[in-house]
Curated annotation (Swiss-Prot):
Role: Isomerase that catalyzes the conversion of deoxy-ribose 1-phosphate (dRib-1-P) and ribose 1-phosphate (Rib-1-P) to deoxy-ribose 5-phosphate (dRib-5-P) and ribose 5-phosphate (Rib-5-P), respectively.
Compartment(s) of residence: Cytoplasm
Organism of origin: Clostridium perfringens (strain 13 / Type A)
Name by which UniProt lists this protein: Phosphopentomutase
Gene for this chain: deoB
Pathway entry: Carbohydrate degradation; 2-deoxy-D-ribose 1-phosphate degradation; D-glyceraldehyde 3-phosphate and acetaldehyde from 2-deoxy-alpha-D-ribose 1-phosphate: step 1/2
Cofactor: Mn(2+)
GO molecular function, one term: manganese ion binding
Enzyme Commission designation: 5.4.2.7
Amino acid sequence: MSKYKRIFTIVIDSLGIGAMNDSEKYGDVNVDTLGHIAESVDTFNIPNLQKMGIANLHPIKHVAPVENPIGYQAKMAEASVGKDTMTGHWEMMGLHITKPFKTFTDTGFPQELLDELTERTGHKIVGNKSASGTEILDELGEHQIATGDMIVYTSADSVLQICGQEETFGLEELYRCCEIARELTLKDEWKVGRIIARPYLGTKKGEFKRTSNRHDYALKPYGRTVLNELKDNNFDVISVGKIKDIFDGEGITEGNKSKSSVHGMEQTLEIMDRDFTGFCFVNLVDFDALWGHRRNPQGYAEELEKFDVNLGKVLEKLHEDDLLIITADHGNDPTYTGTDHTREYVPFLAYSPSMKGHGQLETPKTFATIGATIADNFGLKMPEGTIGESVLNKLV
């Protein structure tokens, strides 16, 4: 008999809580996503995260620690090499990434790859550099609309991103080109973690807006994860946001795309009204995409306050035999130089209405603590070659 019938894990994408011990190896010095956001604003009101003990883990301006937080808290460390979305999420479900995914941040993509992409898609390519999505649209959006060329760019992550204006380039055409790019980049020397379709609207510089029709074409996980174990043993695995894309559909029984992080929380609240047995895995991407990468601490703080209101509704809806875990996949300090992710600890906040105790757990050495705890709860073995130790027996 499972201790919890339903487990909900909500990933606040990029909500790091302070530099990891090895962060300087990643070029990240004194980074602190949550701490620096709080220092950048005049007021910061997150009463539900506060009640769950987030300020007990980490000093946060305007948010005091609480004497008796609900549930259990820990600062989780990342065992894998990297600080990107796929590494973080794959590790949560048990995989240990020891070789970083290929990046083309400094060089752009090889000409041979671009030539093949042009030949297969029929579109010339412009861009081919590391850039922020909004800047590259201002630079090349008008050119694309006039010529039909493809805007290809990358970032510090292992990604090849293709932009297409929805009305002139066409959404289906953009997806077709991305599928070809995914096929081409399965070669070892070009193997990026994700191809991302970046559709946008608008006709001139300063007015371009990316739409919610983004699609990620990820590599399949290189091994079995906790999600596969759950699905193969007839448990529900319901995803919200970009989770299905991150795992290329592996181990997911139902995928729900979100238009925004607020929408993702609304979807989660609807799923909570359903009767199911298994796991609901939620990713809220706006924190990272709209505020972290764009180095906007004010926007990030406001998004967290909106999230906290919906978190209150989630807490109210939890059944006695539900478990809620709030976490993140990496940091993205909006006050730090550049536009890239930051290597940080992430929160592990676990709560069920059936808990009698509360308190801080020792720092787990891996994000896979989450996957191991889920597997343990449902009486499943961790897949061969995975990492992670369950803390289920500590959640009392």
